[in-house]
C-alpha cells in the first residue's frame, strides 16, 4: 500500500478532523484573522455619523441642477449649521 502524500487538500482535511469535538460536532474555524480585523475596522468607520453626513451632502450636491459654486457653498453651509445645532440640542 502506498502512503498518502501530504497535499494541501489532505493537510486541510486533517486540520478539520483534528478540530472535531468528542460529540462529532466540528468547531468553527475562523476565517483569516486579518480579514476579520479589516471587516471590524470597516464597520467602525462606516458607522460613524460623519460618514453619514458626507453621504447626505454628496446626494444634495448631486441633486442640484446647474449649481454655481457660491450658491452651492451657501446651501451646504446653511445645512451644516442647522445639523450642528440639532446635535448640540439633542
Curated annotation (Swiss-Prot):
- Give the keywords, sorted: Apoptosis, Host cytoplasm, Host membrane, Host mitochondrion, Host mitochondrion inner membrane, Host nucleus, Host-virus interaction, Inhibition of host innate immune response by virus, Inhibition of host MAVS by virus, Inhibition of host RLR pathway by virus, Membrane, Modulation of host cell apoptosis by virus, Viral immunoevasion
Source organism superkingdom: Viruses
Annotated segments matching region Disordered: 1-34
Listed under GO cellular component are: host cell cytosol; host cell mitochondrial inner membrane; host cell nucleus; membrane
Keyword rRNA processing on this protein?
no
Q: Which family does it belong to?
A: Belongs to the influenza viruses PB1-F2 family.
Kindly provide the name given to this protein in its UniProt entry: Protein PB1-F2
Species of origin reads: Influenza A virus (strain A/Hong Kong/156/1997 H5N1 genotype Gs/Gd)
